[in-house]
Amino acid sequence: TLMGGALKVPGNVTPVTEANINQDPEAADEVFRSNLPLTMIGLDVTTRTLLTKEDTKKWRELGTVAGEKYADITDYYIDAYKVTRPHLGGCALHDPLAADAAVDPSLVDTIYLNMKVDTKGAYAGRTIGDETRINDEARQTQAAVNVDKERFVKTFMKHLTDLFAQN
């Protein structure tokens, strides 16, 4: 399971590239073409799993150092999103969703698709179906296209709130 890419939504670095893939499109392309079974948790689903200042307020209300510090860090991230992605209304839980989906694949709905990453030109870093393997019966990548966001965010908040309550 990897966090990276954007299949049907705009990128977060350029209109077509997601930040993790954008760092090294050639390496990402090798991974997608490796014939390893992969699950791609991209912006299509991660930008639906949001934390808001209402969530961080719950951590502050715990009255613990951990709750206060993590609320500060997350609020900073939320404020950054107000500049870069104001339409979202919070900060996306990119990596936590990928980690949780690796443990509980039922969190996401996927489609099977052989993927590639464009490595040259204006679209370098774009994750897209590989037209040279479109008819291959063996499809190696499950690209997440939907997420049970309520269940994920509720579980995420419960785990962290319980942890922060202790410290």
Describe the predicted segments one by one:
Residues T1-T47, K53:
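Active-site histidine-anchored catalytic micro-motif
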Residues N22, E26, I41-N167:
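Conformational coupling and interaction surfaces
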